[in-house]
């Protein structure tokens, strides 16, 4: 089955024991990393059907559409799958900040050698 996933032209996601795949989300225009989330089969189907990014919330155990409360949705441009189909790359057009903190990206802090965190000026809150 693994060889088939590597060479097939069919979408056959390999879900983990919790029924999830990792989804890496980048801005389709800038290629900036926006967020990492998880998707189950329902989230993948909803995203493909609506063109809006949906994810599975592990903390709430619920399907959610990015932006359903904030208005900062993610319009799908392209969905890619990695070689063994256990991770997805979503190229999106964001309607606002991707992070719940109001920042463009969830990756706004750099981990320093001493274990401290440096806030990155190029990803200030909007």
UniProtKB/Swiss-Prot annotation:
Residues annotated as binding Mg(2+): 82, 84, 86
Binding site for Zn(2+): 83, 99, 106
Enzyme class, UniProt record, top EC level: hydrolase
Cysteine pairings via disulfide bonds: none
Cofactor stoichiometry and binding remark: Binds 1 Mg(2+) ion per subunit.
Subcellular localization: Cytoplasm
The protein's assembly and partners: Homodimer.
Family membership noted in the UniProt record: Belongs to the PRA-CH family.
Function summary: Catalyzes the hydrolysis of the adenine ring of phosphoribosyl-AMP.
Name of this protein: Phosphoribosyl-AMP cyclohydrolase
Lineage: Bacteria, Pseudomonadati, Pseudomonadota, Alphaproteobacteria, Sphingomonadales
Gene: hisI
């Amino acid at each position: 089955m693994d060889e088939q996933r590597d060479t097939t032209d069919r979408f056959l996601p390999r879900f983990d024991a919790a029924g999830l795949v990792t989804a890496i989300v980048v801005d389709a225009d800038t290629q900036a990393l926006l967020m990492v989330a998880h998707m189950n089969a329902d989230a993948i189907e909803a995203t493909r059907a609506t063109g809006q990014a949906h994810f599975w919330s592990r903390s709430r155990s619920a399907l959610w559409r990015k932006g359903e409360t904030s208005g900062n949705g993610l319009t799908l441009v392209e969905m890619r799958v990695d070689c063994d189909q256990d991770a997805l790359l979503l190229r999106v057009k964001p309607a606002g900040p991707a992070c719940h903190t109001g920042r463009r990206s969830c990756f706004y802090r750099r981990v320093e050698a001493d274990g401290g965190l440096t806030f990155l000026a190029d990803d200030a809150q909007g």
